[in-house]
Amino acid sequence: MIRSELIQKIADENPHLYQRDVERIVNTVFEEVTDAMARGDRVELRGFGAFSVKKRDARIGRNPRTGDTVHVEEKHVPFFKTGKLLRDRLNGKA
């Protein structure tokens, strides 16, 4: 599912809301999650999961084509951990 499909589904299930309002709400949610993660905060959506940022330390890597060693800088990557309710539903337990 892509963002526009999510917006359309929410708008279809809530006919009292205009699609442009639903789009603003969805975009605001994504912006807030992104901003919180950019600050290094953890975003927890109970039952669904938690978004956080993990630090990957600098390391010595290898160029697979040439075999040369290369220095890979430290970086921060997004991480998602599923919540129990989502995990259970995906495994047919709910």
From Swiss-Prot:
CDD domains noted in UniProt: IHF_B
Keyword Ubl conjugation: no
Pfam families cross-referenced by the UniProt entry: Bac_DNA_binding
Entry's Gene Ontology BP terms: DNA recombination; regulation of DNA-templated transcription; regulation of translation
Residues in the signal sequence: none
Gene Ontology CC: one annotated term: cytosol
InterPro entries on file: Hist_DNA-bd, Histone-like_DNA-bd_CS, IHF-like_DNA-bd_dom_sf, IHF_beta
Highest taxon listed in the record's lineage: Bacteria
Name under which the protein is recorded: Integration host factor subunit beta
Species whose genome carries this gene: Ruegeria pomeroyi (strain ATCC 700808 / DSM 15171 / DSS-3)
Lineage: Bacteria, Pseudomonadati, Pseudomonadota, Alphaproteobacteria, Rhodobacterales
